[in-house]
C-alpha cells in the first residue's frame, strides 16, 4: 500500500516542482528543504528513466544532478548543496525501484513529466 501511494506523490512533486516557469510576480518563498526535495525528485526520475526505461540518451548521474542544480539556480535557488541533492536523489531512486506501480506506467509518466528537464539535459551536452 505504501508503495502504491509513493508513486502518485512523486508524480505530483515532479509535475509541480521544476516544470513550471518562474512567475514574474513575487510568490511565497520555497523552503530550502522543499527546493532540495523537488530537485532530487526530478534527478531521481531522470535516473530511473536512464536505468530502468532504456533511456540510454541520458547522461551520467552526476550530470543529471548538475542539471537539476542549474534548474534550481534559474529559479533563484542558489543554495542547493550538491552532496545533499545526490544523497536525497539516491534515496528517492531506491524508493522508486521498490514502488509497486507497473514499470511501464512509471516509464510512461516520467517520460511525459520530465520532458522539459530532459530537453535541458540535451541542451547542456
UniProtKB/Swiss-Prot annotation:
Q: A GO term (biological process) for this protein?
A: intracellular protein transport
User: At which residues does the record annotate a lipid attachment of kind S-diacylglycerol cysteine?
Assistant: 18
Positions with an attached lipid (N-palmitoyl cysteine) read 18
Tell me yes or no: is Cell inner membrane among this UniProt entry's keywords.
no
Matching InterPro entries, A to Z? Answer: Chap_lipoprot_PulS/OutS, Chap_lipoprot_PulS/OutS-like, PulS/OutS-like_sf
**Which Pfam families does the entry mention?**
T2SS_PulS_OutS
Q: Does the keyword Membrane apply?
A: yes
One cellular component term from this protein's GO annotations in UniProt: cell outer membrane
As for what it does, the entry says: Involved in the secretion of pullulanase.
Which NCBIfam families does the record associate with it? PulS_OutS (TIGR01004)
The protein's name: Pullulanase secretion protein PulS
**What gene is behind this protein?**
pulS
Amino acid at each position: 500500500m505504501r508503495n502504491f501511494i509513493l508513486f502518485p506523490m512523486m508524480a505530483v512533486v515532479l509535475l509541480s516542482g521544476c516544470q513550471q516557469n518562474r512567475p514574474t510576480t513575487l510568490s511565497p518563498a520555497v523552503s530550502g528543504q522543499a527546493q532540495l526535495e523537488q530537485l532530487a525528485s526530478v534527478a531521481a526520475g531522470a535516473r530511473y528513466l536512464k536505468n530502468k526505461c532504456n533511456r540510454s540518451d541520458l547522461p551520467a548521474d552526476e550530470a543529471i544532478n548538475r542539471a537539476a542544480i542549474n534548474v534550481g539556480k534559474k529559479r533563484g535557488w542558489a543554495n542547493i548543496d550538491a552532496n545533499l541533492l545526490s544523497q536525497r536523489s539516491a534515496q528517492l531512486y531506491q524508493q522508486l525501484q521498490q514502488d509497486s506501480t507497473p514499470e511501464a506506467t512509471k516509464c510512461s509518466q516520467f517520460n511525459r513529466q520530465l520532458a522539459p528537464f530532459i530537453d535541458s539535459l540535451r541542451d547542456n551536452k
